[in-house]
Design a protein with these regions (language model features):
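Membrane-proximal, proline-rich intrinsically disordered regions
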Residues: 21-78, 465-510
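C-terminal functional modules
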Residues: 376-510
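Structured, solvent-exposed acidic/aromatic patches
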Residues: 79-381, 419-428, 433
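Bimodal feature
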Residues: 1-3, 20, 45, 185-186, ...
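Extracellular glycan-recognition regions
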Residues: 24-26, 101, 455
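Beta-strand acidic-aromatic groove motif in beta-rich domains, primarily in extracellular
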Residues: 63-72, 149-150, 233-234, 442-447
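Bacterial Sec-dependent N-terminal signal peptides
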Residues: 1-30
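Terminal processing/anchoring signals of secreted or surface-associated proteins
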Residues: 12, 21-24, 54, 137, ...
């Protein structure tokens, strides 16, 4: 692993976290004490710098943040990539070190501190506050979906009080509602756009785009809680669609960094290769997006793309890098965080549940999700793909000299929509295609597997520390909480509703 624990903690604790680190996102050279208070207020420089910091946590592309928050968790557990270092302890095998468990939560204090500074400098009455609410919601949705209960006002202290996952979701919904109301009621959006464009790494100051993103987060949330809060979910989803979600690829939430986090961890460092699960589905479906997603391995065989089974006992990272395909990204490839394709699939599921998603049918939104994905990746052949009612996932054949072994296919679901299929078949077909289209957003891929059980994934090829799950339901809390925050930790486990381990389910899984 390419991150030092000491350096990582230093990175988190340095006061310069709100200044020098932001220089990696935009060309801002903040000379610290040389700036007067008046100069800090000029062009909203002070509040803008904290909003940049918030974006760095909400959409982590810096290599250490990306690896510890995204790669080690969602990308591996969502079966997009798999860890190919020799380390025999990781989340896939249900036995990661405490450092791996603690890392995602360690990014909460910086975004909370930055949010509080935005409020101090700006107040709570305009689109700047709305933007901060949206960024915090994006980050905390990930935190709670990794751990379950989580401190909402985390400041890195020893007295952090945990909130239940349900309460966190309710707070995030309220925050997003407040944010969209503030944006809609603002009469100076053109002026605000010009002011904040230098600090907006996603939409260049276009707050109408942030409004669509906030509504899209609400639709994502609604689908996630649909099994445990069906009435609330329907109301939230219908409101989000009515108010306007992301529907065009030009509105997709993407962010550019000076070096793509996925490129750094997978290509430059070589810590991962593509997972056998997504390769087997896409190979079986003859999916033309494969060449956009993956690269051919150095040691090629009968297949152009070869994945490695999740949890494979890696004997040599050097050999694994040669045998298996890596991701097809460059240093400048933008990170992808929410797309029109995902929203179309959410609408498709909503209609399947009886929600009003704007008048379309499940079939229409399902096909729109696939079309949007093909267009997003600039791939031809979508008409042929949509009509394929015979292709299924293929059996996985490991490469000669590989580490995971062969595995028979675990799904027979086809691509073409069938209104006469059973509800289970419809859900499997819909979520399997959604999972393929969500790539490379591993956190959302993992969320879908946990929430629905789809797509079906391969068993792990080695012992999993006594667990019978195919992928964890959550990540355990930092064990240091048992020492330094014991009373609140005990309460957090009560809120969790089960042991502090990999098996206890999320609130929205029950």
């Amino acid at each position: 692993m390419m991150v030092s624990r000491k350096l990582f903690l230093l990175f988190l604790c340095l006061p310069a976290i709100f200044s020098s680190c932001t220089g990696r996102f935009v060309d801002i050279n903040r000379p610290g004490s040389k700036l007067s208070p008046d100069e800090l207020k000029r062009d909203n420089y002070a509040v803008g710098s904290f909003l940049i910091q918030m974006q760095g946590v909400a959409f982590p592309e810096q290599e250490n943040a990306y690896q510890t928050m995204i790669d080690f968790v969602g990308n591996y557990l969502g079966r997009y990539t798999t860890y190919t270092k020799e380390l025999p302890k990781n989340h896939t095998l249900f036995n990661a070190s405490n450092a791996w468990c603690a890392w995602p939560a360690s990014y909460a204090p910086p975004i909370v501190s930055a949010f509080n500074e935005v409020v101090k400098l700006n107040g709570k009455e305009n689109v700047t506050y709305a933007w901060a609410l949206i960024l915090r919601a994006q980050a905390f949705l990930r935190f709670t979906d990794i751990y379950g209960p989580f401190p909402l006002s985390m400041n890195n202290g020893s007295d952090e009080v945990y909130s239940s996952q349900r309460d966190i979701y309710l707070q995030l919904i309220n925050d997003l509602n407040e944010a969209t109301t503030l944006i809609v009621s603002d009469t100076h959006l053109a002026q605000e756009r010009e002011t904040f464009a230098p600090y907006d790494l996603v939409y260049k100051g276009d707050f109408n785009q942030w409004r669509k993103f906030a509504n899209s987060l609400k639709l994502r949330i609604a689908v996630r809680i649909s099994n445990v809060e069906p009435v609330m979910a329907r109301s939230l989803a219908e409101q989000a669609v009515r108010d306007g979600v992301i529907e065009e690829n030009e509105d997709n939430c993407t962010i550019s960094y000076h070096k793509s986090g996925l490129w750094t961890t997978a290509v430059s460092w070589g810590d991962s290769r593509i997972c056998a699960d997504i390769e087997s589905y896409m190979t079986g479906y003859k999916d033309p997006r494969m060449s956009k997603y993956f690269l051919q391995p150095i040691s090629t065989g009968v297949r152009r793309f070869i994945g490695c089974r999740a949890g494979a006992p890696i004997g040599s990272n050097v050999v694994a890098k040669r045998l298996y395909s890596t991701v097809n990204v460059s240093q400048t490839t933008p990170g992808i965080w929410l797309t029109a394709s995902e929203m179309a699939f959410c609408k498709a599921e909503g209609v399947l549940r009886g929600w009003n998603m704007g008048g379309g049918t499940t079939k229409e939104y399902y096909e729109e999700g696939i079309r949007r994905s093909f267009s997003q990746w600039d791939v031809d052949g979508v008409a042929t793909y949509l009509m394929d009612n015979t292709s299924t996932e293929t059996n996985y054949i490991d490469v000669i000299g590989g580490y995971g072994g062969d595995a028979g296919k675990v799904s027979t679901i086809t691509i073409k929509w069938d209104d006469n299929a059973t509800m289970a078949e419809k859900m499997e077909r819909l979520i399997t295609q959604k999972w393929i289209a969500l790539y490379p957003n591993g956190q959302e891929a993992w969320n879908e597997i946990r929430r629905t059980g789809y797509p079906h994934i391969f068993a792990l090829p080695q012992s999993t520390n006594g667990y019978t799950l195919l992928t964890p339901n959550r990540i355990p809390f930092d064990k240091n909480q048992q020492i330094y925050n014991r009373q609140n930790y005990t309460r957090a486990v009560e809120l969790l509703g089960g042991p502090d381990d990999y098996a206890t389910r999320m609130w929205w899984q029950r």
